[in-house]
Amino acid sequence: MDADDTPPNLQISPTAGPLRSHHNTDGHEPNATAADQQERESTNPTHGCVNHPWANPSTATCMESPERSQQTSLFLLKHGLTRDPIHQRERVDVFPQFNKPPWVFRISKLSRLIVPIFTLNEQLCFSKLQIRDRPRFAGRGTYGRVHIYPSSKIAVKTMDSRVFNRELINAILASEGSIRAGERLGISSIVCLLGFSLQTKQLLFPAYDMDMDEYIVRLSRRLTIPDHIDRKIAHVFLDLAQALTFLNRTCGLTHLDVKCGNIFLNVDNFASLEITTAVIGDYSLVTLNTYSLCTRAIFEVGNPSHPEHVLRVPRDASQMSFRLVLSHGTNQPPEILLDYINGTGLTKYTGTLPQRVGLAIDLYALGQALLEVILLGRLPGQLPISVHRTPHYHYYGHKLSPDLALDTLAYRCVLAPYILPSDIPGDLNYNPFIHAGELNTRISRNSLRRIFQCHAVRYGVTHSKLFEGIRIPASLYPATVVTSLLCHDNSEIRSDHPLLWHDRDWIGST
């Protein structure tokens, strides 16, 4: 490839978020009804667009020029890409492109003021993918499988038709957010969709060198780690925190599946393991929170006047399921686990997920991922056995139960003083972690309090000697500070503490 033709050096995780059975596509309608079509045709196509968050009046058309279309076709034919046309037209057909698109969707019109109708970027839609590159099978989930095309540096996720539309819409919304985050704030930590096929039920994403799980394994095998690698890890997770905050607050999207397996990385080289790119991906569980303006959105594929396909955001996309929130129970913040234990709060909530709750969940899970990097990637060499961030699932049959929730909270209380710093830069009154006695007062039933106390005492007896052997290198101090902030008991500190957003001089140069 020529230098200008090289697509970004990117990978999707082979195990990133297996497709879940909870997805429901009943809200999708493959084609608009006659009444809907008549209403859209009678609606002023520019009315209300300027004030809509996705509106871009300077780029009102989705059709590219014949010259640009021909250039795109020649570029992709050069690299062995072909596809059948979505519909017949006189100009040269358009082929999928593997660089990040300049836009994913644009406002077309508004229907009844609360139903935005968007036009999807036609360049993202293809009928069939043909690449002169031998794919590598990367993994299989419940409803799909992933293949990596190493030379083209793309990952193709082929999905079951029952969940395809839901994840496609999630990816469309998050990808437009990825582009906006880069343009407005320089945030580049959100995976962007490169293409999709309605016919073959495929999603195209960039391919990355590895996910964070693999990075932890590689890091744990290193005998020595340069200080700048540790500081880089702190920078990377601050970038990811900003990306999740942008998704939640600006796009109205809560990820709900933040974990090491869904954080994808590029490294400078496999010898140094210095991270050059880190992004959050896998939109299987994304939920629209109370800040979303797209809960009733319609996406049209093809010519806006005569769309080939119509995608509708399903009604349950913005309905919070507490069972879904708890799907990764050991990643959840204390307030969510306490709601589950006490049967209060979100357990009785049936509306749209509050934005502040969604952000608190995502950031806490991100902090747990960073804690995993520290414990399993950086400390194994100094301890006789590995220290994990949670109790092992196999004791509980890999299912969340009130006893596992109590066990998890007790384990965190005992582990935290050995890992998290007692103070942080510029905050003399900072309390880095919650103690078992304080947490015990927030458990409503006496019987459950006794269980929690038993777990805490047990871990103090069985694990204190192991934890006392932990020595945090000075170069890891910034990473432990970030962990402390993201995993703080106070959800407001998680999202708004100045160290997360202000100058990062306190970390030191990388």
Curated annotation (Swiss-Prot):
Reactions catalysed according to its record: L-seryl-[protein] + ATP = O-phospho-L-seryl-[protein] + ADP + H(+); L-threonyl-[protein] + ATP = O-phospho-L-threonyl-[protein] + ADP + H(+)
Binding site for ATP: 138-146, 157
SUPFAM superfamilies: Protein kinase-like (PK-like)
Record keyword Kinase present: yes
Assigned keywords, A-Z: ATP-binding, Host nucleus, Kinase, Nucleotide-binding, Serine/threonine-protein kinase, Transferase, Virion, Virion tegument
EC number(s) per entry: 2.7.11.1
Organism: Varicella-zoster virus (strain Dumas) (HHV-3)
The protein's role, per its UniProt record: Multifunctional serine/threonine kinase that plays a role in several processes including egress of virus particles from the nucleus, modulation of the actin cytoskeleton and regulation of viral and cellular gene expression. Regulates the nuclear localization of viral envelopment factor proteins 24 and 27, by phosphorylating the protein kinase ORF66, indicating a role in nuclear egress. Disrupts host nuclear lamins, including LMNA and LMNB1. Phosphorylates the viral Fc receptor composed of glycoproteins E (gE) and I (gI).
Highest taxon in the source lineage: Viruses
Region spans: Disordered: 1-63
Classification of source organism: Viruses, Duplodnaviria, Heunggongvirae, Peploviricota, Herviviricetes
Other comment: Displays a substrate specificity similar to host CDC2.
UniProt PTM: Autophosphorylated.
Gene3D superfamilies: Transferase(Phosphotransferase) domain 1
Name assigned to this protein: Serine/threonine-protein kinase UL13 homolog
Name of the top EC class for this enzyme: transferase
Record flagged with keyword Nucleotide-binding: yes
Domain Protein kinase: 132-458
Subcellular location: Virion tegument; Host nucleus
Active site per the UniProt annotation: 257 (proton acceptor)
InterPro entries to which the protein is assigned, alphabetical: Kinase-like_dom_sf (IPR011009), Prot_kinase_dom (IPR000719), Ser/Thr_kinase_AS (IPR008271)
Cellular component, GO annotation: host cell nucleus; viral tegument
GO molecular function, one term: ATP binding
Family: Belongs to the protein kinase superfamily. Ser/Thr protein kinase family.
